[in-house]
């Protein structure tokens, strides 16, 4: 409510999808937007600079569609899109031409009935693709399984199986690109958050089910997760306060 009233006046049925920290709006930087229905759009970062308090429209959405994620790019990256049913597609961002703010975008991934996009990320070689499911399962997969030797796929296809979704695992809730130096925060709909090292999550191929990474009580589901910088655990001697003072509540 505070964000809606003081920063960006949005409608009651709207919500903030992404926030990106920017200092400048150069001509050679871009925003890539991906929607729930698999549409992708690329615009120049400089085209959204505005002093208008009401903001500007950056994409025209079809009825029933919604913006899932926004990523800043340098114009020469690959984009990975992942769906609820575990399908994944990776293509060059240059496959998506730059458009004006009012354009609707183009097809990024074709979806089978009932499926929808849950996340997208900038693909990086020497990193891993992390997917986590509603029932607390997860896995890392080497990026090379998505970026072939001859380059990424072409946009607009059905993609490849990125997760073997079963009744046991539940559907995929999102995707992040991680390295061994990252940590991962996982949250469930009961409000419980756990933190773990990305390196501690096992690596499997695209068609594997992964392993249990969060124990859940009956009826509780994982709803989201985030990548964050790795935090070394420091063991303090008994009775001593760790360096830097006590952790704030």
Outline where the language-model segments fall.
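Short, structured "edge-of-domain" segments at secondary-structure transitions
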Residues: 1-249
């Amino acid at each position: 409510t505070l964000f809606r009233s003081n920063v960006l006046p949005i409608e009651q049925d709207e919500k903030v999808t992404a926030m990106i920290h920017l200092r400048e709006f150069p001509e050679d930087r871009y925003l890539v937007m991906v929607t729930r229905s698999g549409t992708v759009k690329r615009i120049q970062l400089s085209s959204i600079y505005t002093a208008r308090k009401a903001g500007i429209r950056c994409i025209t959405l079809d009825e029933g569609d919604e913006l899932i994620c926004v990523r800043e790019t340098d114009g020469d990256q690959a984009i990975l899109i992942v769906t609820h049913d575990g399908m994944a597609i990776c293509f060059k961002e240059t496959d998506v031409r730059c458009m004006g703010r009012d354009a609707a975008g183009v097809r990024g991934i074709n979806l089978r009935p009932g499926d929808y996009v849950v996340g997208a990320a900038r693909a990086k070689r020497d990193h891993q693709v992390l997917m986590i499911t509603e029932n607390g399962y997860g896995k890392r997969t080497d990026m090379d399984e998505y970026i072939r030797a001859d380059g990424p796929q072409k946009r607009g296809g059905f993609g490849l199986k990125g997760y073997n979704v079963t009744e046991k695992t539940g559907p995929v809730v999102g995707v992040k690109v991680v390295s061994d130096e990252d940590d991962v925060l996982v949250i469930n709909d009961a409000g419980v958050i756990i933190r773990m090292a990305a390196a501690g999550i096992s690596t499997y191929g695209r068609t594997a089910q992964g392993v249990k990474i969060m124990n859940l009580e009956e009826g509780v589901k994982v709803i989201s997760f985030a990548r964050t910088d790795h935090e070394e655990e420091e063991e303090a001697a008994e009775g001593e306060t760790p360096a830097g003072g006590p952790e704030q509540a």
